[in-house]
């Protein structure tokens, strides 16, 4: 693709982009107008408060309830992991809703603006879900609560990557949503998909690289069974994706990296739910037998 085909500044394209910019400018100008400014600022501060302090308060409350009502063991650790992940998703979702309310309370956004806001809010929830999953599985602050058999050194080394992946997806996903709203050219859509594929592949690549370096540095044993195959499969998948990018097959690379991302999210979610459910059944069976 040439620069002109990737960024086709035709009259129609410029008109759509300008209209969206006008819509965004209208919403923000209304939100910070003298009569609405304090409400917007209060919603912005409330969103930050919920995101930072609210998550800790909710997480602490859920942890206290879990410790109080569930017996020690894998069931408690499963519930604690779910509580940590749930607290992250709920608080970030509420913060995004408050920010949207502060922006749109005193204005009537256009259809394109409403579509963009809806898509961005969904994207925020998905990115928050990724961050919550990472925190729930790694449990850096509470190693004794960790469900997977992950050494502390590896958990600490991999800790920043769920947040990094969530932030990267938020930035690139925003561009994808804008392209969708303004109905941009196919060439630009494919180019953004290629950038998404490159970003996701690099995050997974550096996470895998840090995993191997940490394992060698601390002479840690490799995982056994099916879990031991995960680094190899992920590495091969990333390699194929990067080769597709280098070969110019952007759509194929995008397909592979999106599948890798979704399989990782689904597998991690299923692991948490199955661990919690199976342990709940085991504890229930033991209680029935004791009676």
Spans of model-derived segments:
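Hydrophobic/aromatic interaction determinants used to assemble and anchor large protein complexes
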Residues: 26, 30-285, 291
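Short, small-residue-biased leader/transition segments that mark boundaries at the very start
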Residues: 1-12, 284-287
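Generic intrinsically disordered, low-complexity segments enriched for polar/acidic and small residues
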Residues: 1-4, 18, 208, 215
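Low-complexity, acidic polar-rich segments
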Residues: 6-30, 231-234
């Amino acid at each position: 693709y040439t620069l002109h085909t990737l960024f086709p500044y035709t009259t129609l394209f410029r008109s759509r982009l300008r209209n969206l910019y006008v819509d965004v400018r209208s919403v923000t100008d209304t939100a910070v107008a003298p009569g609405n400014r304090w409400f917007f600022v209060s919603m912005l501060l409330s969103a930050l408060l919920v995101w930072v302090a609210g998550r800790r308060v909710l997480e602490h409350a859920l942890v206290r309830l879990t410790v109080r009502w569930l017996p020690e063991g894998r069931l408690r650790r499963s519930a604690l992991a779910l509580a940590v992940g749930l607290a992250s998703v709920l608080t970030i979702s509420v913060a995004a809703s408050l920010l949207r309310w502060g922006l749109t309370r005193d204005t009537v956004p256009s259809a394109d603006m409403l579509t963009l806001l809806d898509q961005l809010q969904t994207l925020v929830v998905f990115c928050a879900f990724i961050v919550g999953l990472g925190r729930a599985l790694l449990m850096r602050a509470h190693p004794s609560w960790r469900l997977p058999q992950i050494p502390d050194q590896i958990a600490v080394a991999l800790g920043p990557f769920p947040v990094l992946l969530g932030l990267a997806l938020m930035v690139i996903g925003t561009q994808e949503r804008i392209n969708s709203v303004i109905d941009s050219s196919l060439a630009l859509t494919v180019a953004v998909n290629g950038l998404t594929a490159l970003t996701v592949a690099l995050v997974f690549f550096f996470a895998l690289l840090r995993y191997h370096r940490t394992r060698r540095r601390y002479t840690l044993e490799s995982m056994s069974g099916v879990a031991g195959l995960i680094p190899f499969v992920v590495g091969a998948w990333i390699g194929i994706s990067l080769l597709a990018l280098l070969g110019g097959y952007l759509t194929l690379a995008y397909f592979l990296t999106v599948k890798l991302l979704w399989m990782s999210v689904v597998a991690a979610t299923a692991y948490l739910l199955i661990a919690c459910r199976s342990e709940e059944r085991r504890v229930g069976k033991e209680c029935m037998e004791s009676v």
